[in-house]
């Protein structure tokens, strides 16, 4: 890392986060394109054309800045300027390169803060905590002792100007932020860079790295405020939350006789809960507590006001649900989570008398919902919305072994991810859909019926649809009968899963 710092000449800009000169360094764009130091934590291969001229990128930045200061109204292009061509190149392509390079540069101060934070501390070398499954053992251990939770969908999108204003408190470099604001507002197709959807928010394939950085920064800022409220909850009776509106004075407390905020227009309630747990994945988060739903209502009130007063986002009430774990299930990361009361009878013997004691134990229950899986398969054209299998004509040109392997890989990935549920009935139906879809694809290729093709193929088709844990079971119990389903009852969490595989991505 020391060599990397010298290579970027960070010792000249590190003290004041002066990153503006780095934007004009050509090797920054080489790093952003994956041409050097691919093993770094925050550099990834972006897959650009090797024929791209970094010199043109540098000239393009200079031209944009010149245009910005020459035009009275900060017009991006003159009347006779072609927005699609500049210096014989595609402007959109090089604007994309500028965004990617800028994302790399802006990430540097945050990475340096991370290094300074980790100095003198024992770093966890294992990547297991990055796995999606690493969260479920924690939920198993904690959720059975909790009563209520908030099911939160983080609101979006945030206006880009708000993100720039928030970013300036962390990156104290006005020149870089002015250039960033100029790119965002004067980019010819900046509205198409982000694609809002009904229930989610996604980024276009162009400039993903840059806007992922802005979105992650927004979530980080929201969570820092949340953590501040959580840690300072016992002091809210004498502290104004006016500091939430000014990030510069974030950690400075303003003592007031009465707790009345200027922006929130409400009196803060005092609360303190040592059994408060927070979990987030992408835009969905969970706030669970052992206390009553009254505390959850207070937290809901605070979160809504934070989003409206600090980020100027109107949060719809339906985006935050108060859920009682004992009565409802929680949809999280492809599972339905709930806490069920499992009755148990204990016989007690006292001298000559015996009696039964009825007891109820809270048990963390995990179910794989079938509807989202079937919907995902139907979008990928493996079946219809009711689960009736289709053939895949686009795969019919491949070899038989390749077709079987592709179908088998999709099922193994789905079964691998949903191995944490003890109830496998949903996975059995998914296996049925994929096996029949595979058989119909092969029959279509060989211009035969499914029945005759399966008779000729035998059980060879089934072998590709066995997962690793099923193979271990059948090797251990080779003579297991139909009762094997009852014997094979165990919950497995894999620590090598970093994303949810969508069947549509296997197209």
Swiss-Prot record:
A Pfam family: MatK_N
Record keywords, A-Z: Chloroplast, mRNA processing, Plastid, RNA-binding, tRNA processing
GO biological process: mRNA processing; RNA splicing; tRNA processing
Predominant subcellular localization, coarse grouping: plastid
Signal peptide positions on this chain: none
Entry GO MF terms: RNA binding
Location in or out of the cell: Plastid, Chloroplast
InterPro entries: Domain_X, Maturase_MatK, Maturase_MatK_N
Ranges annotated as spanning the membrane: none
Residues forming coiled coils: none
GO cellular component terms attached to this protein's record: chloroplast
Family affiliation: Belongs to the intron maturase 2 family. MatK subfamily.
Function: Usually encoded in the trnK tRNA gene intron. Probably assists in splicing its own and other chloroplast group II introns.
Protein name (record): Maturase K
Species annotation: Lyonia ferruginea (Rusty staggerbush)
């Amino acid at each position: 890392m020391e060599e990397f710092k010298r290579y970027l000449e960070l010792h000249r800009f590190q003290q004041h986060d002066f990153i503006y000169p780095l934007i004009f360094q050509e090797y920054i764009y080489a790093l952003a394109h994956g041409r050097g130091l691919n093993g770094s934590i925050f550099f990834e291969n972006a897959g650009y054309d090797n024929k791209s001229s970094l010199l043109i990128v540098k000239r393009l930045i200079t031209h944009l800045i010149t245009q910005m200061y020459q035009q009275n109204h900060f017009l991006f292009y003159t009347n006779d300027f072609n927005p699609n061509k500049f210096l014989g190149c595609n402007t959109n392509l090089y604007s994309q390169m500028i965004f990617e390079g800028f994302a790399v540069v802006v990430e540097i101060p945050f990475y340096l803060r991370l290094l300074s934070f980790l100095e003198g501390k024992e770093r966890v070398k294992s990547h297991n905590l990055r796995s999606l499954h690493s969260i479920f053992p924690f939920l198993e251990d904690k959720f059975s002792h909790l009563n209520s939770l908030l099911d939160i969908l983080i609101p979006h999108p945030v206006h880009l100007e708000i993100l720039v204003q928030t970013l300036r408190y962390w990156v104290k470099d006005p020149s870089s932020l002015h250039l960033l604001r100029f790119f965002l507002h004067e980019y010819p197709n900046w509205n198409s860079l982000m694609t809002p959807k009904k229930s989610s928010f996604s980024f276009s394939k162009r400039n993903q790295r840059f806007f992922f950085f802005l979105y992650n920064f927004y979530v980080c800022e929201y969570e820092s405020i949340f953590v501040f409220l959580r840690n300072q909850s016992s002091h809210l009776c004498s502290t104004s939350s006016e500091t939430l509106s000014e990030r510069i004075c974030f950690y400075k407390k303003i003592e007031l006789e009465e707790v009345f905020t200027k922006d929130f227009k409400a009196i803060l309630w005092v609360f303190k809960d040592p059994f408060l747990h927070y979990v987030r994945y992408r835009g969905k988060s969970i706030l669970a507590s052992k206390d009553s739903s009254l505390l959850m209502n207070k937290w809901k009130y605070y979160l809504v006001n934070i989003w409206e007063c600090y980020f100027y986002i109107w949060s719809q009430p339906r985006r935050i649900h108060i859920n009682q774990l004992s009565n409802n299930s929680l949809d999280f990361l492809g599972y339905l989570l709930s806490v069920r009361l499992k009755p148990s009878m204990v016989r007690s013997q006292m001298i000559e008398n015996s009696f039964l004691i009825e007891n109820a134990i809270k048990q963390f229950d995990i179910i794989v919902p079938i509807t989202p899986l079937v919907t995902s398969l139907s979008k990928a054209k493996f079946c219809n919305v009711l689960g009736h299998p289709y053939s895949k004509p686009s795969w019919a040109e491949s070899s038989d072994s390749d077709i079987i392997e592709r179908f088998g890989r999709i099922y193994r990935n789905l079964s691998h991810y949903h191995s944490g549920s003890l109830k496998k009935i949903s996975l059995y139906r998914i296996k049925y859909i994929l096996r029949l879809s595979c058989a119909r694809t092969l029959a279509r290729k060989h211009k035969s019926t499914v029945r005759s093709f399966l008779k000729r193929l035998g059980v060879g088709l089934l072998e590709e649809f066995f997962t690793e844990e099923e193979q271990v079971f059948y090797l251990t119990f080779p003579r297991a009968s139909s009762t094997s389903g009852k014997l094979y009852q165990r919950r497995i969490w894999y620590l090598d899963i970093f994303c949810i595989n969508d069947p549509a991505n296997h197209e």
